[in-house]
Design a protein with these regions (language model features):
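Conserved small/polar residues in nucleotide/adenosyl-binding loops
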Residues: 1-4
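Active-site cofactor/substrate anionic-group-binding motifs, chiefly glycine-
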Residues: 10-73
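Short glycine/serine/threonine-rich phosphate/pyrophosphate-binding segments
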Residues: 26-28, 122, 127-134, 193-197, ...
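A glycine- and small-aliphatic-rich helix-loop capping segment at beta-alpha/alpha-beta transitions
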Residues: 33-39, 135-147, 227-233, 280-281
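Glycine-rich, mobile lid/loop segments that gate access to catalytic sites or pores
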Residues: 81-130, 135-141, 152-156
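Phosphate/pyrophosphate-binding betaalpha-module
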Residues: 120, 131-195
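Hydrophobic alpha-helical bundle architecture
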Residues: 198-237, 256-263
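Internal helix-turn-beta structural module
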Residues: 243-292
């Protein structure tokens, strides 16, 4: 039950936090869309026109976008840098950027939890972000690059080959430090994914449940669990993505997704769909009457009735 309460309390205050960032690796042609889509979609979410915005309205959750590393030139405190390094040949970020990004996520979790939320949803936004996510999962689970590569935004075969090469090269750069998750995170992820790690770990520290979204958030969860063992006890796997690396991460985390609808959008959209099911489950546990409370006959009643209807044995029938 949610937050160790049974029956669980209604989820009256839920916030979806979308961590946004651009990725240097996108210049390698690993996505079907141009990089300026990231900033445009962040604006679309905030104006209520994105899929997660529409779903959130139906599910009863607010949505907040945090620009961690979009190519936006933002001067906000949460903005670490414009984009990240191309992870196939350079570090995703400096050590200072890594620390600051981690703190952005920690602060975001604290802010929402201090405001009284019952549950959090974590989402992602950024063209090319499934590439560092797959590289992280591959590196931390010692899985071959070709096994973790998915189609992302719907790339063709040539795009898939470019993406495979990028992930292979990124994983090679950290092949000797698989047991150093913080360094792997700094070298082949991104500031926005690093912020997600801080967010997930801090939510667990604060004993606040989080519904995870797709491959990017599951990659962050994999790192967060390694940095803060036991954190996964506070997470729910929202849905199974079509990305193969997500399945590997969920298996490593021992989490079972609530739904499998073939979703691949990101933004936290799959997790918001799951929220509707979680809310339904809470209502069932809180409000559905038992057979006894409703005065409905049970199987035991049928057995008792059958015993009463059986004819009595005649005395002396057996000698």
């Amino acid at each position: 039950c949610i937050r160790d309460r049974c029956p669980p309390q209604p989820l009256n205050d839920v916030t979806t936090v979308v961590f946004a960032g651009d990725h240097g690796i996108a210049s390698n042609g690993v996505s079907a869309y141009p990089t300026d889509v990231s900033v445009q979609m962040a604006s679309n979410i905030e104006s209520g026109g994105a899929a997660v915005s529409v779903l959130a309205k139906r599910a009863g959750t607010s949505v907040r976008v945090i620009d961690v590393s979009l190519n936006s030139g933002s001067e906000a405190d949460t903005h670490i840098c414009d984009g990240s390094g191309s992870i196939d040949r350079e570090d995703a970020m400096s050590r200072d950027e890594y620390r600051r990004a981690l703190q952005v996520g920690i602060d975001a979790a604290d802010r929402e939890i201090d405001s009284g939320v019952d549950l959090l949803i974590a989402g992602d936004l950024g063209i090319g972000n499934t590439t560092p996510a797959a590289a992280l999962i591959g590196a931390l689970t010692n899985t071959e690059p070709v096994v973790v590569v998915g189609r992302g935004t719907g790339i063709d075969d040539n795009g898939w080959k470019r993406k495979t090469a990028a992930i292979r090269d990124a994983m090679y750069r950290v092949h000797n430090i698989h047991d150093e998750p913080a360094s792997v995170l700094q070298f082949i992820s991104s500031p926005d994914i690093t912020a997600m790690v801080g967010f997930l770990a801090q939510a667990a520290v604060r004993r606040t449940p989080v519904i995870l979204d797709g491959i990017v958030m599951c990659a962050a969860a994999l790192v967060a669990e390694k940095l803060a063992p036991g954190a996964k006890q506070w997470w729910v796997a929202g849905h199974r993505s079509v990305e193969p690396a997500q399945k590997i991460a969920l298996r490593e985390l021992e989490l079972t997704p609530v739904v499998d609808l073939g979703m691949r959008l990101g933004e936290g959209s799959g997790a918001v769909v799951t929220l509707m099911i979680v809310n339904a489950a809470v209502d069932i546990i809180r409000n559905m009457a038992t057979f006894d409370e409703a005065g409905v006959s049970t199987a035991a009643d049928a057995e008792d009735s059958g015993a009463e209807d059986s004819p009595a044995e005649a005395p002396g029938a057996e000698e």
